[in-house]
From Swiss-Prot:
Its EC number is 2.7.2.3. Keywords: ATP-binding, Cytoplasm, Glycolysis, Kinase, Nucleotide-binding, Transferase. This is Phosphoglycerate kinase. It is found in: Cytoplasm. It is an enzyme of class 2 (transferase). It holds the Pfam family PGK. Monomer. It comes from the Bacteria. Belongs to the phosphoglycerate kinase family. CDD domains: Phosphoglycerate_kinase. It comes from Oceanobacillus iheyensis (strain DSM 14371 / CIP 107618 / JCM 11309 / KCTC 3954 / HTE831). The gene is pgk. ATP binds at residues 201, 323, 349-352. GO terms for biological process: gluconeogenesis; glycolytic process. Pathway: Carbohydrate degradation; glycolysis; pyruvate from D-glyceraldehyde 3-phosphate: step 2/5.
């Protein structure tokens, strides 16, 4: 990675404004999954061990520039205190007198968490006044929030332009895993793209077709491709306006010598529910009033065998409606294939990360990305503003 990292900074006695991604799921004020907090620990622990005064900033949810009591970061501060084994101070303001006072009292190795940065309308607008307030709090800037790296906000890009700015350990790990995969892949290189809609994955599919040996398609978006092949798909998800594009992608794959792999059978249901009647049918035999909600058993075997023969696999998007157990089998089969492959497995955040967590397979993967939108944009070949704003080595 050609950006400065925390290893390039002298942090002892310095105030370090550290953008983290603590956007964790909450239920009744309790954190239900602390993965993102744990992911930031290596950076926080290195900074505190080296005697920095660590000022942590994060968003939580979408308060849209106003104070939403349920989205305060107090539960996060409590959980972080437990994980670090030391007190984490927390302010009720994002900036202002209370924050200035807390920072002035912070000791070397101390940790302070400021309030949810999205309580300020200026955060998402990258407002110069808020940027100035953040910059005045600190001597150095560290971005460890890969999950927010695709946002050009005050705490991700604005302040990075005002202070010496470096990547944290998680940011570095994410960029190296995804960057090496896309720039210098071991082959055979397989990408699996799932999810509901073609329109959300157009740029990803287009960019990956220039890089991969196998492109496996699953999830709702597969049925627009099946339709483009001339098959009837019943009531399955269809984007009429993307049929021509689907044909273009299949032609591009042919020209590039990419093995473009679509489902050969599907689990169809007579209703979108857990209680629906279901059956497995070949892909060209979907009944007119049924819809396909998961890949079938032959498809699972086919996809699994391609994964097992690959040296590198990137996966983004589920194979079916995995939130309903009746239609989770395809996603689970792919997750199990990735867990058991000898090749390097990368899970591209979002629903795929949620799926491998659900099936208890996250530990078996080589890299599970913490950023859904950010990893998607990185896979599209886009420049991430939060990364671009950091100092070059």
């Amino acid at each position: 990675m050609n950006k400065k990292t925390i290893n390039d900074l002298q942090v002892e006695g310095k105030r370090v404004f550290t953008r983290v991604d603590f956007n964790v799921p909450l239920k009744d004020g309790e954190i239900t999954d602390d993965t993102r907090i744990r992911a930031a620990l290596p950076t926080i622990e290195q900074l505190t061990a080296q005697g920095a005064k660590v000022i942590l900033a994060s968003h939580l949810g979408r308060p849209k520039g106003t104070v939403v009591e349920e989205l305060r970061l107090d539960p996060v501060a409590d959980r972080l205190s437990d994980l670090l084994g030391k007190e984490v101070l927390k302010t009720d303001q994002v900036y202002g007198e209370e924050v200035d006072q807390a920072i002035s009292e912070l000791e070397n190795g101390g940790v302070l968490l400021i309030e949810n940065v999205r309580f300020e309308a200026g955060e998402e607008k990258n407002d110069p006044e808020l940027v100035e307030a953040f910059a005045n709090m600190a001597d150095l800037y560290v971005n460890d929030a890969f999950g927010a790296a695709h946002r050009a906000h005050a705490s991700t890009t604005g302040v990075a332009e005002k202070l010496p700015a470096a990547a944290g350990k998680l940011m570095e790990k994410e960029i190296e895993a995804l960057g090496n995969a896309l720039e210098n892949p071991e082959r055979p290189f397989t990408a699996i793209v799932g999810g509901a809609k073609v329109k959300d994955k157009i740029s990803v599919i287009d960019n990956l077709l220039d890089k991969v040996d196998n492109l496996i398609i699953g999830g709702g978006l597969a049925y627009t491709f099946i339709k483009a092949q001339g098959h009837e798909i019943g009531k399955s998800l269809l984007e009429e306006d993307k049929i021509d594009l689907a044909k273009e992608f299949m032609n591009k794959a042919k020209e590039k010598g990419v093995n473009f792999v679509l489902p050969v059978d599907a689990i169809v249901a007579d209703d979108f529910s857990e209680e629906a009647n279901t059956k497995i049918v070949d892909i060209d035999k979907i009944p007119s009033d049924w819809e396909a909600l998961d890949i079938g058993t032959k498809t699972r075997e086919k996809y699994s065998s391609i994964v097992k023969d690959s040296k590198l696999v990137i996966w983004n998007g589920p194979m079916g409606v995995f939130e309903l157990n009746a239609f989770a089998g395809g996603t689970k089969a792919v997750a199990e294939a990735l867990a058991s492959t000898e090749g390097y497995s990368i899970i591209g955040g979002g629903d795929s990360a949620a799926a491998v967590e659900k099936f208890g397979l996250a530990e078996e993967m080589d890299h599970v990305s913490t950023g859904g939108g950010a990893s998607l944009e990185f896979m599209e070949g886009k420049v991430l503003p939060g990364l671009a704003a950091l100092n070059d080595k």
